[in-house]
């Protein structure tokens, strides 16, 4: 072991081979690496060399730092973080699309970790390249701005600005102006609709449930009291008995149309459903029925990418979305469902690239398109799981 650089940390022999069999290992010697909380990070029969061992230990001891270092490789000279990338040929290849979602996630994580340089880079890009009339266009693709915003992304950017203002000061005017712009564009009868055209030519008529970040709305009410009513209506939508698909599938429905007082019956996209559950959990409104269902699915082995309204896995969606596990780890941490948090984090960490050029990434090393959403939500999950 010392030849692999393993010194100064606890080593344990699996004397009765219980762990060997539990993890499904097939050869001797094998190695299992755990973090300080006993979370399994890696189990392998390929014994690492000294450099690989150092990266494995770094993943165990400083997982967020490793992932953040990878993420910073994607940052462009103007502060943009592409929403997709591929890993191939020993290099990271960024995509040509920037989402307000990704930029808002970056701003929020930077504010919460007091990373002033990262926050400044992301905020300057949002302010200078993505903002039109106080709203943030949801996408810039190959340099071309989208015509509309996404109200959740504007809420997330506002949350990041509020947290930055609490740490460094100097953002109150921006918060007030952007909160007023979002209210004027996207609030109808106290309901936050999903989007508005940034030129003022129209808006959506549906409320996307995963956009209902009530906690942020309540924080915004300190700057603009009108957001109190929006928060109250949003909480009422989330707690409406019709918001869950069924007792057999207690996931939140995708959307609600206020004019028709009707919830949609569309299939549940798991990452969106997980975000809705997280927002509900943050205000202690996530039902035990929903949390127990998640526990049961994870206990049975997996939570899949989509579920039809009848509770069956959607055709072509019997795969696991890594971003949903990152969000569900946060749900477990916020709601006190420790087993949900633990199992979700285990699923997440099983996808971590722990060694090599791409250490810290959660994407595919086979050249497939990967999403920075996953790395960013993983960073929030790791923060939420800190003892």
Task: Name every feature range the model reports, one short phrase each.
Residues 316-320, 326-368:
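C-terminal structured domain segments
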Residues 67, 71-105, 110-113, 118, ...:
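Internal amphipathic alpha-helical repeat/solenoid segments
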Residues 110, 115-128, 156, 162-165, ...:
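Aromatic-lined substrate-binding rim segments of carbohydrate-active enzymes
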Residues 64-68, 73, 93-101, 135-137, ...:
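Extended ligand-binding clefts on enzyme/binding-domain cores
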Residues 65-66, 273, 279-285, 334, ...:
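Terminal, non-catalytic domain-edge segments
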Residues 107-114, 156-167, 215-219, 278-282, ...:
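Short glycine/serine- and small hydrophobic-enriched flexible loop segments
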Residues 110, 123, 161, 179, ...:
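Inward-facing hydrophobic residues that define packing positions of alpha-helical scaffold repeats
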């Amino acid at each position: 072991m010392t030849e692999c650089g393993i010194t100064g940390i606890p080593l344990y022999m699996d004397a009765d081979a219980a762990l060997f069999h539990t993890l499904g290992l097939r050869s001797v010697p094998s190695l299992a690496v755990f973090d300080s909380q006993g979370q399994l990070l890696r189990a392998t029969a390929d014994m690492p060399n000294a450099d690989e061992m150092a990266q494995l230990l770094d993943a165990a001891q400083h997982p967020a730092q490793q992932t953040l270092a990878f993420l910073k490789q994607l940052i462009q000279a103007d502060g943009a973080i592409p929403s997709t990338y591929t890993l191939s040929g020993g290099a990271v290849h960024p995509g040509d699309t920037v989402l307000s979602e990704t930029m808002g996630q970056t701003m929020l994580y930077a504010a919460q970790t007091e990373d002033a340089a990262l926050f400044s880079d992301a905020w300057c890009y949002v302010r200078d390249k993505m903002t039109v009339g106080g709203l943030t266009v949801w996408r810039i693709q190959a340099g071309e701005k989208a015509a509309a915003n996404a109200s959740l992304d504007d809420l997330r950017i506002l949350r990041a600005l509020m947290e930055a203002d609490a740490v460094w000061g100097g953002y109150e005017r921006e918060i007030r102006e952007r909160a007023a712009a979002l209210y004027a564009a996207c609030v109808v009868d106290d309901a936050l609709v999903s989007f508005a055209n940034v030129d003022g030519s129209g808006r959506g008529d549906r409320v996307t449930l995963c956009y209902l970040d009530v906690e942020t709305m309540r924080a915004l009410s300190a700057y603009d009291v009108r957001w109190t009513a929006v928060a109250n209506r949003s909480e009422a939508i989330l707690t409406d008995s019709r918001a869950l698909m069924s007792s057999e599938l207690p996931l939140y429905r995708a959307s609600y149309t206020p004019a028709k007082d009707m919830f949609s019956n569309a299939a549940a996209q798991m990452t969106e459903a997980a975000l809705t559950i997280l927002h509900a959990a943050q205000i202690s409104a996530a039902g035990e029925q929903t949390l127990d269902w998640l526990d049961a699915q994870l206990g049975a082995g997996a939570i899949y990418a989509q579920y039809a309204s009848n509770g069956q896995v959607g055709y072509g969606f019997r795969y696991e979305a890594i971003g949903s596990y990152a969000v569900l780890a946060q749900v477990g941490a916020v709601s006190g469902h420790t087993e949900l948090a633990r199992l979700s984090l285990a699923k997440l960490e099983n996808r971590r690239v722990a060694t090599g050029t791409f250490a810290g990434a959660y994407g595919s090393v086979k050249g497939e398109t990967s999403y920075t959403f996953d790395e960013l939500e993983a960073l929030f999950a790791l923060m939420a799981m800190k003892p």
